[in-house]
């Protein structure tokens, strides 16, 4: 098996830097759009054969060093009792706003309520045949709470902050329930065959460092500590966390994901030894001429200074209108420029 990705997660030496892309199975690939044209997004997420097919596309087309389960961070929230639709973004029919709403939420029976997720994982492990490892994933408790309380996407998520400040008992009860659900969900992914886990805290960076430490850190720490991590590394990605990386590290995780607002050398200094890092090319670089893409890849590699425990990725998900050939070129640049 190509173990570069897993070796890098554990900080072991590798022959070159492993590379994969957040949202690598997505709309920038014509092959993905051909599948997506036949079904809705939710149908794609819930049809194991199709979801496995699009999960494999970046491995075959781009040559990345890891596959990631095709799903959505909100997938496990729906069976908690929240009707979800995508129109086109995620919308919950009835947001969580009070203690009664929290009390109505249930912890799903994972294999009964979400069998398609684990079927996708099992299909992928079979189809990958150990060519590359498989990453499972989930949303961090705070990011899931942002959507559940707001009811949809937002730039500032006022409702979750209002709850956090004005109804701390409701907020705490919600976060406890989401954390328990997430722990069971991610452990079920590991049991089904996921070989690494990424926790996406897309909205953790909307909080001040003080509020993150008080209102988010305890829940994320409980989640990470509750995962079956003996042979399964955990990647913890908090978008916008450049000013609080030391706190993010306190939550645990074997790899800290970085966005493009912090350079790798600075992040390494803040995080200290003993933890791997992943990132952190600005996704919009992939719209540039290929000569510029190569320069930017080299810059990121130089910032890492050849240290072990590094996984090349974008600083967030690949954008849907990026030319697929540029994504492939970026992967090739990493492979060529980082080989020891």
Swiss-Prot record:
It is an enzyme of class 4 (lyase). One of its GO terms (cellular component) is cytosol. Keywords: Cytoplasm, Decarboxylase, Lyase, Porphyrin biosynthesis. It is found in: Cytoplasm. Signal peptide: none annotated. It catalyses: uroporphyrinogen III + 4 H(+) = coproporphyrinogen III + 4 CO2. Catalyzes the decarboxylation of four acetate groups of uroporphyrinogen-III to yield coproporphyrinogen-III. GO terms for biological process: protoporphyrinogen IX biosynthetic process from glutamate. This is Uroporphyrinogen decarboxylase. InterPro entries: UROD/MetE-like_sf, Uroporphyrinogen_deCO2ase_HemE, Uroporphyrinogen_deCOase. Pathway: Porphyrin-containing compound metabolism; protoporphyrin-IX biosynthesis; coproporphyrinogen-III from 5-aminolevulinate: step 4/4. The record marks 72 as: Transition state stabilizer. CDD domains: URO-D (cd00717). Its EC number is 4.1.1.37. One of its GO terms (molecular function) is uroporphyrinogen decarboxylase activity. It comes from the Bacteria. Substrate binds at residues 23-27, 72, 147, 202, 316. Belongs to the uroporphyrinogen decarboxylase family. The gene is hemE. The lineage of its organism: Bacteria, Pseudomonadati, Thermodesulfobacteriota, Desulfuromonadia, Desulfuromonadales. Homodimer. It comes from Pelobacter propionicus (strain DSM 2379 / NBRC 103807 / OttBd1).
């Amino acid at each position: 098996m190509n173990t570069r990705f897993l070796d890098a997660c554990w900080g072991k030496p590798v022959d070159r830097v492993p590379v994969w892309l957040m949202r690598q199975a997505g709309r920038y690939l014509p092959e993905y759009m051909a599948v997506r044209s036949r079904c809705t997004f939710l149908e794609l997420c819930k049809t194991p054969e199709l979801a496995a097919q699009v999960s494999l596309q970046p491995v075959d087309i781009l040559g990345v060093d890891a596959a990631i389960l095709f799903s959505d961070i909100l997938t496990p929230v729906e069976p908690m009792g929240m009707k979800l639709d995508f129109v086109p973004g995620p919308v919950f029919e009835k947001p969580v706003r009070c203690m009664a709403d929290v009390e109505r939420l249930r912890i799903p029976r994972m294999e009964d309520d979400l069998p398609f997720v684990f079927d996708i994982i099992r299909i992928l492990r079979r189809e990958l045949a150990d060519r590359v490892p498989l990453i499972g994933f989930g949303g961090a408790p705070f990011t899931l709470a942002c959507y559940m309380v707001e009811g949809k996407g937002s730039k500032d998520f006022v409702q979750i902050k209002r709850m956090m400040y004005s109804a701390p008992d409701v907020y705490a009860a919600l976060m406890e329930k989401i954390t328990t659900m997430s722990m069971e969900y991610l452990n079920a992914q590991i049991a089904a065959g996921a070989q690494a886990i990424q926790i996406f805290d897309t909205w953790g960076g909307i909080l001040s460092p003080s509020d993150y430490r008080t209102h988010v850190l305890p829940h994320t720490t409980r989640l990470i500590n509750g995962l079956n991590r003996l042979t399964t590394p955990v990647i913890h990605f908090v978008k916008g966390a450049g000013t609080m990386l030391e706190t993010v590290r306190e939550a645990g995780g074997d790899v800290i994901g970085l966005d493009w607002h912090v350079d790798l050398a600075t992040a390494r200094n803040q995080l200290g030894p003993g933890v791997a890092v992943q990132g952190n090319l600005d996704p919009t670089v992939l719209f540039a001429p290929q000569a510029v893409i190569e320069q930017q890849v080299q810059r990121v590699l130089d910032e890492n200074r050849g240290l072990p425990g590094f996984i090349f990725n974008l600083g967030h998900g690949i954008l849907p209108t990026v030319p697929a050939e540029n994504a492939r070129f970026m992967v090739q640049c990493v492979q060529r420029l980082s080989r020891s």
